[in-house]
Amino acid sequence: MALVTDKTITPKRLELKKVYSTYEFASLKKRLLLSNLRFRKTFPSRQINSLYFDNSEYSAIDDSISGSSERKKTRLRWYGDLEQAIDPVLELKLKKGSLSWKELYSTSLKLKPSADNWLNAFTATENDSHHLNIKDILPPDHTIPISLVSYYRNYFESFDGRIRATIDMNLSYRDQTLQRQPNFKIQRMDSSKVILELKLAKENLNLLRDLTYNLRFTPQRFSKYCESTFQHRVKWR
């Protein structure tokens, strides 16, 4: 039974982020819709859940904090109910210089939230009795479940389709190193900020001039995975 299928590699692009206060959400949305790029809502808002994997050295965090020119993050992503992961997507998020892209792998997995640990928390979608070790589908350098991050995403796109924008809010972080069992209950909420991200091909960067002025948008580094693991940073400082 093929548990991982349909590999997709996304185009390389710029991903520019800025953190705003939650009370600015309505204003941000209005400015996007009224901008010269005439953004429009293109997809229903939804909750995104990402289970991040790393290693005992926390190398993905170290690369991000140090600003390494080449980075990789490994995560399983699904949408909607936190404990209802069916056919999650395995994502390798890659970055080289200023450009980011993903390797996406469809899976035929279903989460068993009552499992005694993450490594055997998934079964085959078509056969509940077919348990597997999640390490079997993960890259060998990122096999330890570290953090479960959830947030609510709003989707927008410019009128010509050349720029995508997302606004993320209601972030929550669940440390998966606290216990052997999957941790869905103990969480740290962050409802004080929203994250605006602009996604575009490098050749379209010139289109942002007026938009970034109106949005008071100065790109800054922000990683949800890094934010989720701040309590562990003493381990590599």
Please identify what each model-predicted range represents.
Residues 1-237:
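Phosphate-end processing signature that detects enzymes handling 5′-triphosphorylated RNA
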